[in-house]
A protein has these predicted regions:
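Short acidic, hydrophobic short linear motifs in intrinsically disordered regions
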Residues: 26-37
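Short Lys/Arg-enriched alpha/beta "domain-start" segment
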Residues: 76-126
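Short amphipathic alpha-helical interaction segments
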Residues: 39-54
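A short, conserved structural fragment
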Residues: 53-63
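Charged, low-complexity intrinsically disordered regulatory/assembly segments
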Residues: 113-192
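Beta-strand residues in well-ordered beta-sheet regions across diverse protein folds
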Residues: 59-61, 68, 151
């Protein structure tokens, strides 16, 4: 850690970045996802992330940005009690679907007007998030014990019907990927 970097040295943008990165355990967020979610200009976000990286508070990997380590000497007062996205769809995944492979096929992918935001994994639950191009709505797919829950979190006054429609778009996207996986796992019998 950079000893010259103190918690009180944080500006508002740095606090917002840390708040988002700390919103879920072991979370990784893409640059574009952070930009859309926080509404920052890309140059401003780049400078903010660079300063936090230089202070060894966050780290960048091919999977995105995340808080560095656990039990940091900093006690950033940015932990949120952010409520989980409003659950809209609960469904079970087919037993043939390997969650790791499903995640690999969905990670970084866009659908409709939603862009990849990031993911977190706490051992028992995988959470993947997408954000609308305008940054007004976030969708989240949580997978645990063969069950998938899709929820929406609006950062503005999106109507409930808009949230439901967006959740079903994500569900359709995930369903198509899962169906492809099931077809590959159990190809149709060929008649002679």
């Amino acid at each position: 850690m950079n000893p010259a970097f103190e918690e009180f040295d944080l500006d508002e943008r740095e606090r917002e970045v840390l708040k988002l990165l700390s919103s879920e355990q072991n979370a990784h967020f893409s640059f574009q996802g952070l930009r859309r979610r926080l509404g920052l200009h890309q140059e401003t976000l780049t400078r903010t992330l660079k300063r936090l990286e230089e202070a060894h508070v966050i780290e960048r990997s091919p999977e995105g940005y995340k808080l560095k380590g656990t039990g940091s000497i900093y006690s950033f007062a940015v932990q949120t009690n952010q409520s989980l996205a409003k659950p809209i769809i609960d469904a079970y995944l087919p037993s043939q679907v390997d969650v790791t492979v499903l995640f690999q096929k969905l990670r970084g992918r866009w659908f409709s007007n939603f862009r990849w935001l990031g993911y977190s994994h706490d051992g028992s639950q995988l959470s993947m998030s997408w954000i609308s191009e305008d940054g007004r709505m976030q969708l989240q797919a949580r997978i645990s014990s063969g069950k998938i829950t899709i929820g929406a979190d609006s950062h503005t006054n999106q109507t409930e019907s808009e949230q439901i429609a967006a959740a079903y778009q994500l569900f359709d996207h995930i369903t198509k990927v899962a169906e492809e996986m099931v077809q590959v796992a159990s190809p149709a019998l060929v008649a002679n």
